[in-house]
């Protein structure tokens, strides 16, 4: 909140003029960061995960990427996560895109028979968003976790979160 655009330019090692050429305000900078994170997830799904047959494993990797990417700039990512919850916010569209990405993967998992089809996809997406918000706001030491610790803890929470909506065995 108290970080200025000058601070951002200095940390990014670019001139203030260069920063302002791309981002006219802190809000536009936040939007750019959120859009870049979503683009990275889209690339992950299109490239690295394109041959992964299990949609639940794709969901796991997407959640890992969202959380691991937030660690480096945790305060900023927490602000983005908070702001994109409000329809009035310019960042709200990024939330809708995140929901769409998760919803697509949930629907794939339901079609594969690994997630229960009798549970609305939106309810499962809500569970996953709850997990994401838990990592951002309820894990105070998130920034101190090693990558391995974070993945281990997130995987455990992911499994617990989806336990009630997983099928006993895929159809």
For every predicted segment, state its role.
Residues 32, 43-72, 121-128:
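Hydrophobic alpha-helical connector segments
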Residues 67-104, 122-123:
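Short secondary-structure transition hinges
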Residues 30, 34, 38, 88-99, ...:
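Amphipathic, non-transmembrane alpha-helical scaffold segments
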Residues 15, 25-26, 54, 120:
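Short coil/turn motifs that cap or connect alpha-helices
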Residues 1-2, 13, 21-46, 60, ...:
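An amphipathic alpha-helix adjacent to DNA-recognition modules
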Residues 61, 68, 100, 104-112, ...:
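C-terminal peripheral helix-coil segments that are non-catalytic and often amphipathic
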Residues 7-11, 19:
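Append "Primarily bacterial transcriptional regulators
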């Amino acid at each position: 909140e108290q970080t200025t655009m000058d601070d951002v330019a200095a940390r990014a090692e670019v001139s203030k003029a260069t920063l302002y050429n791309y981002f006219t305000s802190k809000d536009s900078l936040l939007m750019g960061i959120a859009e870049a994170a979503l683009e990275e997830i889209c690339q992950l799904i299109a490239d690295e995960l394109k041959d992964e047959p299990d949609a639940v494993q794709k969901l796991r990797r997407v959640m890992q990427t969202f959380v691991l990417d937030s660690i480096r700039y945790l305060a900023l990512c927490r602000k983005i996560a908070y702001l994109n919850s409000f329809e009035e916010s310019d960042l709200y569209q990024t939330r809708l895109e995140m929901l769409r990405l998760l919803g697509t993967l949930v629907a794939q998992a339901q079609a594969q028979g690994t997630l229960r089809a009798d549970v609305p996809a939106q309810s499962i997406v809500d569970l996953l968003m709850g997990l994401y918000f838990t990592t951002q706001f309820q894990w105070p030491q998130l920034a101190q976790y090693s990558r391995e610790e974070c993945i281990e803890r997130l995987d455990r929470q992911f499994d617990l979160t989806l336990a009630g909506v997983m099928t006993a065995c895929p159809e």
